[in-house]
Amino acid sequence: MIKEEEFFSTDEKVISNTINSYTSLIKQKYGNIIKRVILYGSWARSEGDSSSDVDLLVITSKVPVKTKLDIIGTACSYFTKTDVYLSIKVFSEDEFEQEKDYSFVRTILQEGRQIV
């Protein structure tokens, strides 16, 4: 979880609360399926502002595509409540491992902050 004291501005507190709320919800809803959640992108680099989306990578055990879409869909409700756009990518552990040599995943591993 992101500690609220890590952030200082109102925007950052809203972001922190939204990330914590979303990750708690998917952990509660999907349990042991959720293996890791990693914050990456501008907020992970402390460069986010009120116009920035929040990039989260959710790593799961092997699940059907429908479950991945449900995990992504769960994030949509947060935009209407908070104006925070959660941009969710979902990879299984195997997919994440296979993608480690690609720049997208390498960047996440370098700059990302593990939330769960």
Regions found by a protein language model. Give the residues of each.
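Short beta-strand->loop micro-motif that forms the acidic, two-metal-ion catalytic signature
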Residues: D55-V58
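Catalytic core of pol beta-like nucleotidyltransferases
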Residues: M1-K35, A44-S50, T60-V116
